[in-house]
C-alpha cells in the first residue's frame, strides 16, 4: 500500500491544471509557487472549514498541484506531457498527519515500519502560526547546541544570528536524534508582513545508529538524497534498484546565507510520540578540511551518477545478449539430443533381429524356431539308431560265445 492510498493524500478525481489551481503563471518561480500554495492551503485547510464540505477537496487539489510544481523533475514532466507523464512515473502524494484520523495514522505508521516510503507535509497550523509571526523563537548561537523534545505535528523554532565573516565562511545547521525519532529540519524566510514563510525542509535520514538532517550553506552546490525515489524504483524493478540509487540526489535550493538572524525549526514527524532531538549551528571556518572533502565527494557522486546511467545502458544490452545466448544454448542442447536419438534409432534398424510387435513374428524368429525343431528331430533319430546298434552288438557277442562253447563241449 502506498501513501497515496491514505485519506487526504489521493489525487483529485477531476484533475485541473496545477498552474490554474495555484493561480500562478507557467513561468512562475519557486518562491511565487510556494507563496501561492501557503495562502491557499491555509484558506482551504479542513480544520478551518468544518462547515464547508468542499474545502477538504479543494485542499487536496491545492496540495496535489503543489506537489507537482514544487518538484523540478515532476514539473518538467508535466510541462512536457501533462498528467500522463506523471502517471507513468507513479508519482506519490504527501500526506498531512494532522488531517488523518487515528485509524489511518495507525496504518501509515505500520506501513512506514514495513519500509513503505510515506512522505508527510508540515501541519497547516504550524505554517499559519509562522506566517502570523506568533511562534516563539529561541536563540541558537553559532557553535552551540540545544537538545529537546517536540510533540508530533508541532515545531520548535530557533534563531541563528550570523556575522558577515561567518556568512562568508559558510554555516551548517544539523539536527540529530539518538532515539532515531522522525523529524524535519525547516528553514523559514521572513516576509514583508513580519511573518515567516517555509522556504526549505530536510527529511531526517537514518545514518548509523541515529537519525539526522542538515542544511549546508557553504557557497557551493550541495545535494540532498531523496530515498523515496530509490524505494519506488526498487519496488518497480528490484534488478534496476542499484542503478537508481543516485537518482534521488537533488540540489538544495539555497547555498548561502547573508549576515543576520535566520529562523530554523525542528518539526516532530513521529506518528504518535514526541521526537527527541539535538540541534546545532556551526561556522564552516573551523571545518575547512571537512568542507573541502564534502565539495569533492559531491562532485564524485555526480560523476558516478552519470557513469551509472551510461553503464545501465551497457548492462541492459549485455543482459539481453546473455539471455539470448542462454536461450540458444537450451535450444541447441535439445537439438543435439534429438539428433543423437534419431541416429541411434537409425542404427538399430540394421538388424535381422527385430523387436516383436503384436502377434506378427519376424523372419529371424521363425527361422530360429524351425532350426530348433529340426535339431530336436535329429536328436530323436540318433537316439533310436544307437539302441539298435547296441542290441545287435549284444546278440553278436552272445552268438560268438555260444558257438565257441558248443565246439568245446562237442
From Swiss-Prot:
Expressed at high levels in root cap, root tip meristematic region and elongation zones, and at lower levels in mature part of roots (at protein level). Constitutively expressed in seedlings, etiolated or not, roots, rosette leaves, cauline leaves, stems, flowers, siliques and pollen. Residues 284-344 form a coiled coil. One of its GO terms (cellular component) is Golgi membrane. InterPro entries: DnaJ_domain, DnaJ_domain_CS, J_dom_sf, Plant_DnaJ_domain. It is a peripheral membrane protein. Residues 351-410 are annotated as: Disordered. It comes from Arabidopsis thaliana. One of its GO terms (molecular function) is cytoskeletal protein binding. Transmembrane segments: none annotated. Keywords: Chaperone, Coiled coil, Cytoplasm, Cytoskeleton, Endoplasmic reticulum, Golgi apparatus, Membrane. This is Chaperone protein dnaJ 15. PANTHER family: DNAJ DOMAIN (PROKARYOTIC HEAT SHOCK PROTEIN), J DOMAIN-CONTAINING PROTEIN. The gene is ATJ15. Disruption phenotype: Roots and hypocotyls reorient slowly upon gravistimulation. Plants are normal for phototropism and for responses to hormones such as auxin, abscisic acid, gibberellins and ethylene. They also accumulate starch like the wild-type. In response to gravistimulation arg1-2 lacks cytoplasmic pH changes in columella cells and has a bad repartition of auxin that accumulates in root tips instead of forming a gradient. Residues 357-367 have a biased composition (Low complexity). Belongs to the DnaJ family. B/II subfamily. The keyword RNA-binding does not apply. Plays a continuous role in plant development probably in the structural organization of compartments. Seems to be involved in early gravitropic signal transduction within the gravity-perceiving cells (statocytes), where it influences pH changes and auxin distribution. Probably affects the localization and/or activity of auxin efflux carrier components (PIN proteins) or other proteins involved in lateral auxin transport. Its main location: cytoplasm. Residues 17-82 form the J domain. Pfam families: DnaJ. The keyword Iron-sulfur does not apply. It is found in: Cytoplasm, Cytoskeleton; Endoplasmic reticulum membrane; Golgi apparatus membrane. GO terms for biological process: positive gravitropism.
